Amino acid sequence: MACRTVGISDSVYRYRPDPHRDDEVIAKLQEAVERYPAYGFGKLFKILRRWGHPWNHKRVYRLYCTLGLNKRRRGKKRLPSRHPEPLAVPGQANHCWSMDFMSDSLFCGRRFRTFNLVEDFNREALAIEIDLNLPAQRVIRVLERVVAWRGYPNKLRMDNGPEFISATLAEWAEEHGIELEFIKPGKPTQNSYVERFNRTYRDEILNMYVFRTLNEVRELTENWIREYNEERPHDSLEDLTPWEYLDKHEKLENSNLACH
């Protein structure tokens, strides 16, 4: 009678919140954070969706904040370029690969280098070679290794580093009909695909761990490449992973060919 007087139903009056209602959401959110510690909320929410959980965005974010995950330490924010030079997106794979070098150090202080190779079309990590020294001949060996399963690209984009402007690489590229495109000095935005990839790799691997040996770097990097290509959704790829995006377009091309 009292409920009818104030205009609420008996079920609403008797409602008691379930203290364990969010347990599964919290468990899966913590699992995602543990597996992808460098991801922010947006990426983590997409991971939960990819795992098949249809939970409401606001609900997940509320729990994300309740757990204090929004207060995790972040790296320095990179100031946006005043005059960005967006690269054209290739219409197919093997049109252009971008490559670059990075450097870091082991726990003992010894420096090492990484040679990073990225497919512009689907942002796929084609290779990361790691060693104390990576001369031009070593770069060519990595390229040949990738070419063996991927085919030759039409073009390679790079900066003017000594390994890239060497006659050895120029002769190899000419032999296989590959154009070498050098960006202008001081213009990293002209190689933005691999630059963005480098930042992600540094945030999630190089800055995340202390390495005692090169083999530790290689093992962690190999696992990260698999996750990056197979599990990580990309905003620029319709929230697909690099391999999913490539597979989608290969199927589309095959269906178009079948129609002609």
Residue ranges and their predicted role:
Residues M1-H260:
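Charged DNA-binding/catalytic regions of mobile-element recombinases
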